[in-house]
Amino acid sequence: MTDIVIATYGFGGTKDNSATEKFAERLIAKYKHFGVVVFDWPAHGADSLNRFLPDECMRYFDLTVHYVLEGMHAENLYAYGTSLGGYITLRYLTEYGNPFRKIALRCPAINIYDIMVADITPEEQTKLDRGREIVRGYTRKVRLTSEFFNQLRASDVRKKEYFDFADDMLILQGTKDEFIPFDEVRQFAEDNVIDLIPVENADHPFSDPGIMDLAISKIIDFFHPEQ
């Protein structure tokens, strides 16, 4: 394999998810020289850590980039980031540089701080203020501290510029995303001159199989356009 895609997922999920599996199957079936690498975020899936911090996500992402380039000897590296994965990918570009040939983001969580603080109860805020943890998550419960929220607040990707990467980027955003407002993503894309594909009637996870198939096709065509 000469071309490798690093695929990342959203908060509270796991690398063993059907969306990534379907993407990998279709990509590899069509282009034999492609491969897909996935990994678990800190305190997600099979990872051994208990606490979750965005800066640790950055470290995991960077370790994976170096492993793919140096250990797997990939000639071309691509990024496919979903939700939290999209946020971390955007941070990586401005904080570490761009090792990717092309970058596709599906419903990137550009407003992740706003999302995460929106449902904090007064009781939970008291816990955080006292240095204690609160719990969030789906398939696995994740422990969050005030440091988690502080790191998100300090690294707002909406305040960064992505002009240098825009020619090689694509964003797919659902018009009915219940967490990430479509208009906010559209404004982000316009401000940074990034190509945006509005996906009509798509919710945050792209739960409609037909809509997910369309999104996967668009991303594969972006990574490997037909000659």
What is each residue range found by the language model?
Residues 2-41:
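Short, surface-exposed "cap/lid" segments of acyl-processing enzymes
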Residues 11, 40-45, 109, 202-203:
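Short beta-to-alpha linker loops that shape the active-site pocket of alpha/beta-hydrolase fold enzymes
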Residues 17, 21, 55-58, 182-186:
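Short, surface-exposed alpha-helical segments at coil->helix boundaries
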Residues 42-74:
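Catalytic nucleophile-loop/oxyanion-hole region of alpha/beta-hydrolase
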Residues 52, 99-198, 203-226:
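The alpha/beta-hydrolase serine catalytic core
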Residues 79-81, 106:
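Short beta-strand immediately N-terminal to the catalytic nucleophile in serine-hydrolase-like folds
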Residues 81-85, 89:
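Gly/Ala-rich beta-loop-alpha elbow adjacent to hydrolase catalytic centers
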Residues 91-95:
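Active-site signature of alpha/beta-hydrolase-fold catalytic machinery across serine-
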